[in-house]
Amino acid sequence: MTELERCCREYLGHLSVERNLSPNTVAAYRRDLEAYRAFLAERGVTGPDSVTRRDVEDFVAHRRGAGAADASVNRALSAVKGLHRFLVREGVSTTYPTSAIRTPKAVKRLPDVISIDQACALLDQPFPATAAGARDHAVLEVLYGCGLRVSELTGLDVRDLHLEEEFLLVMGKGSKERLAPITGSALRALDAYLALGARDELMGHARAAGVSPAVFLNARGTRLSRQSVHAICERYGRTVGIEGLHPHTLRHSFATHMLAGGADLRVLQEILGHADIATTQIYTHVDQTQLREVYLAAHPRA
């Protein structure tokens, strides 16, 4: 193990244990730092004190040249800067090659959303009369009905369901718990999945010693993965003409449709689990068709 590899491990442990960052965030930082170490290794750099500002700038340029999105490049730079800052603070390194490197502002893109009609078509389509079909319907209803992140959905345990009170207890980013209200249609889909035996049928495939507390199970009776949720969204989206449907698109659509329906921005911030209301404000965009309609209806010379 090289010195830099050991340093990266210590930093990731710090993020996980002392900073209490979510497993998904730590995993993303791990991937970024592995790419960073591999890039430096090709240059013969194996220790933190040998890293120069030029090395870091070239790594960023390399990531951009590989086609990484601005947000991904900025996250990688944040991981690298955090690593070197940590090493200096801990007395492991005496050089701080990233001190003069500023993180560029990422271009804000409006989130991809589907229309209300498309959402209804997605959720009202006939689902297979199987345990997996009942599960898939519930997955889509909860994603759109509660605005959950995919990691929040897959992390749900049965004890987190408070269906009589009509809310879910969700573990969000930074291990912060919040209450998420649930729609009537999502409640009915969950009831069909849970009370009518679909989950029990999937649970029957699990090994006796490996009974899972998860709400959503795969064909082996274990917790449904993020990748499986992605596949569910793509498959059922495609059947109603929505190509490349992503779980986060349903979260974006939930937020956009809630605001269009008159939801308060602060309330929506709480439901979505955003630490900063500026993150929620991106959903205040209005599509061009609606903008034109409002303009024509309101302007005296239109």
Model-derived features with residue positions:
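Conserved catalytic core of the tyrosine transesterase superfamily
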Residues: 1-302
